[in-house]
Amino acid sequence: IVAFCLLALAGCAPQNAATQGGSSSGAYAVVTDDRGTVVTLPEKPQRVVVLSTSLLNFAAAVDGDLAGRSAVKAEDASLPAKYQAVPDVGPVYNVSLEKVLACQPDLVIASADHHAKLAAQLEESHIPVLVLKTKTYDDVKRNLDIIGKVYGKEDAAKAKEAELDQAVQAIADAVPAQGKRVAIIHATPSSVSVELPSSIAGDMAQRLHLQNIAGGASTDGQTTRIPYSMESLVQADPDVIFLTSMGSSDKIEKRIQEDIKGNPAWASLSAVKAGRVYVLPEKYFLLNPGLDYPKAVAYMAHLVYPESVHE
């Protein structure tokens, strides 16, 4: 059925469908996505489908219309009112190809973390796809730029960026330039790791001048986490420990108990003794907060410096 839909859609695709890396002469817009793919849009898209929650908010920021959207499943995540009646194509982790095709999109905006295979399937049928990553604050601003360009609302995107910059900078200015030493531990039911400055929470910590104990790790530039070691944690002895997680809360608690709290060395850590171990909410620190970036930065800053920053 899927193959038939793809062939049918390819057969009736308009002649001016966007091409990847084709001629940009007279094009409405030419955009390079986070794969390095050059996407040429001959005309302004009229039926845009967005496949992740954070990217939905970027579209809403420039008042962009949608023909389809991802389902909002994450705890406490909110769907912009503008998109309540827009057909959903499934959750970000399990988007339905059939539902995307049913929206008859002339542009799909997808997540680099989840939609590589789906993007390839859509592109085989000459449906243009922008694949974007959203990890750091710089990603947030770049995505705003791109989506503003898609909708022809570059000025609105720039205005929103300026608003975000001002809010984030105000928080950073309110905390010490030489920040406390922190560890950001990520737990899933199967493993425990330590987050790098390239992760969502790590990027925020860096903007708050916090010293990430994993900041000196050598990586390929794309890695956001490295293996956890209690020995390394004890040696670094951070002032504050943040916990992020993904998966069933019962299974995660079991993993944390087995790999972290069950180790006698855990109790010797300065952060543990001082009661400075904090669980970070999924809506801000597992998923990129997007336009709520200032709220997320303020949340972290308040945990570390409650006397200086209020949520």
Give, region by region, the residue ranges found by the protein language model.
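A short, structured surface patch at a secondary-structure boundary
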Residues: 53-103, 107-112, 210-213
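Structured C-terminal subdomain patch of bacterial secreted/periplasmic proteins
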Residues: 141-142, 149, 158, 172, ...
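Extracytoplasmic ligand-binding site segments that recognize negatively charged/polar headgroups
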Residues: 117, 133-146, 181-204, 249-251
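Flexible loop/hinge segments that line or gate small-molecule binding clefts
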Residues: 79-81, 114-146, 150, 278
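Proline-aspartate-enriched helix->loop->beta-strand connector
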Residues: 96-110, 127, 229-243
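Alpha-helical, coiled-coil/dimerization segments enriched in small aliphatic residues
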Residues: 75, 194-224
